[in-house]
């Protein structure tokens, strides 16, 4: 039950479903058959227990169902290894009950007619109490919605939404085929330009030395010139399949459903005359990340290059593709990289010989291994730091107008407080899942050619920024791409940048304020400590 619900709603959420289950069970003398007819709800209950084990709260969200489709097998196996306790609980609770129900059906066991008649008479009173509790919930909380708050009605509603979104996604190529940015370049054609957009994975700002973390997780970036780091940046989603498309397109939490009719930033740069490339260290997710990536002149999802689900290349493999692309010497180049960053299992994100913080094992998903998990996580950020420094060096060696922009799709919970939250993508986000790193690097040539953008970036670095709304817009301005979809009031390299109220994309694709998505006092305390409004 959600902590934000009034007591009347909590009572309703218990009483009404129980009354309906009671009525259904009283319908037949063969309880085993009825129990099996309720199997979909039993399955939801098992799924819910696993979710509670992972996140400690919240019902099965639309995004959870979509993750079943978009999460690849290697990611799933990494997580399943750490869900054994939850799976054991599910097996112990449900398998014996299903076996007993099967025995009841096979042996045609029946409850007595007298017992059933008495149970059916009670049904009227039980259902009346449930309906009365529903009315009370409506009267005492004007925001109460069964489709959002009442289990299992909310789960059924979310399933319907998941099917709807899956159908819309499959139809994307038809609904977006006529879209155009009407983009053009405002930069001089006789100057070579190279711009790189890096989308990180599961990296939270509070573990970056660039933002005051006490550990040396950014030994390379801390000494890089021309780098502007933005401190107060929040993502508008804690799920990869939503956050990354917002980074790569004009949509944000306030306009997310328009994504089915638009294309990504690669198309905008192509229209403006750039040679484009997209390189990813993640597998296909059969959704917008794939769609936007495949808009490029050259694209490669390197994990798909080998027919082995256990293939685990490091992010540094992407640098080989970047070097090859830069070697083409094209006058205008735009490269997008999607890394694997700090995705769990953290220890597998960097070579063992580069482990700096020890011990970094075992790293099972248990509170008692928190220190080991943090060590492994911080090692993965150091590896990201090295990756980004090498990438910047490659651009600097070109001696052209070049720039790099980086952020992460979302952060991560690592048993940080007494809630013992772990991982990300929970239906209710936490501070640790939404505060992300965001920085811009500009080459010497670029800073000399466009000094006003550097000045604006420096002026905006302590302002409140949404990565979901500003990443795309900032890249357009840096690359000199003019389009009706460009909005400089969202670009952190613009003097026109305007701070906006924080919003978050909830499970129903609605933009909600942070205090309306279920975040708790621990999260707001952390935001306040970081000076984030």
Please report, for each region that a protein language model flagged, where it lies by residue.
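Active-site-proximal alpha/beta segments of enzymes that process anionic O-linked groups
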Residues: 129-197, 202-364, 467-468, 473-498
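A long, amphipathic alpha-helix that forms part
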Residues: 320-324, 361-404, 440, 462
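Membrane-interface soluble catalytic domains
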Residues: 26, 30-33, 121, 267, ...
């Amino acid at each position: 039950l959600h902590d934000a619900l009034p007591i009347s709603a909590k009572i309703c959420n218990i009483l009404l479903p129980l009354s309906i289950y009671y009525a259904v069970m009283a319908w037949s003398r063969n309880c085993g058959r009825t129990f099996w007819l309720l199997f979909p709800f039993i399955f939801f209950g098992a799924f819910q227990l696993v979710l509670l084990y992972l996140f400690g709260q919240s019902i099965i969200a639309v995004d959870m169902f979509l993750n079943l489709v978009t999460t690849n097998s290697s990611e799933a196996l990494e997580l399943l290894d750490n869900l054994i306790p939850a799976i054991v609980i599910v097996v112990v609770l449900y398998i014996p009950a299903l076996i007993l129900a099967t025995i009841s059906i096979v042996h045609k066991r029946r409850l007595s007619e007298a017992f059933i008649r008495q149970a059916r008479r009670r049904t009227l009173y039980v259902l009346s109490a449930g309906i009365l509790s529903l009315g009370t919930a409506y009267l005492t909380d004007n925001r109460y919605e069964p489709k959002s708050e009442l289990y299992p009605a909310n789960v059924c509603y979310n399933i319907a939404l998941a099917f709807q979104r899956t159908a819309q996604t499959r139809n994307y190529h038809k609904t977006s085929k006529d879209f155009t940015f009407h983009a053009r370049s405002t930069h001089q054609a006789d100057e070579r330009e190279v711009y790189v957009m890096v989308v990180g994975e599961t990296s939270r700002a509070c573990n970056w030395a660039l933002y005051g973390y006490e550990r040396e997780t950014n030994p390379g970036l801390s000494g890089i010139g021309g780098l502007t780091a933005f401190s107060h940046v929040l993502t508008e989603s804690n799920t990869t399949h939503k956050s990354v498309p917002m980074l790569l397109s004009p949509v944000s939490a306030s306009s997310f459903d328009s994504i089915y009719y638009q294309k990504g930033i690669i198309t905008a740069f192509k229209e403006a005359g750039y040679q484009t490339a997209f390189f990813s260290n993640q597998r296909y997710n059969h959704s917008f990340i794939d769609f936007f990536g495949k808009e490029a002149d050259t694209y490669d999802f390197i994990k798909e290059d080998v027919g082995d689900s256990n293939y685990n290349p490091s992010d540094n493999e992407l640098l080989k593709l970047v070097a090859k692309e830069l070697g083409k010497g094209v006058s205008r180049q735009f490269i997008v990289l999607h890394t694997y960053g700090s995705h769990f299992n953290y220890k597998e994100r960097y070579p063992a010989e580069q482990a700096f913080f020890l011990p970094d094992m075992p790293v099972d998903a248990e509170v008692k291994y928190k220190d080991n998990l943090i060590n492994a996580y911080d090692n993965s950020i150091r590896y990201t730091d090295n990756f980004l420094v090498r990438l910047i060096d490659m651009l600097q060696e070109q001696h052209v107008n070049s720039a790099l922009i980086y952020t992460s799709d979302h952060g991560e919970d690592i048993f940080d407080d007494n809630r013992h939250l772990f991982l990300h993508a929970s239906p209710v986000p936490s501070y640790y899942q939404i505060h992300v790193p965001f920085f811009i690097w500009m080459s010497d040539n670029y800073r000399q050619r466009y000094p006003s953008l550097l000045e604006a970036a420096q002026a905006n670095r302590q302002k409140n920024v949404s990565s979901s709304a500003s990443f795309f817009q900032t890249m357009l301005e840096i690359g000199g791409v003019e389009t009706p979809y460009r909005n400089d009031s969202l670009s952190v390299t613009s003097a026109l940048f305007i701070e906006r109220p924080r919003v978050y994309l909830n499970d129903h694709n609605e933009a909600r304020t942070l205090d309306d998505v279920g975040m708790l006092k621990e999260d707001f305390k952390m935001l306040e400590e970081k000076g984030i409004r």
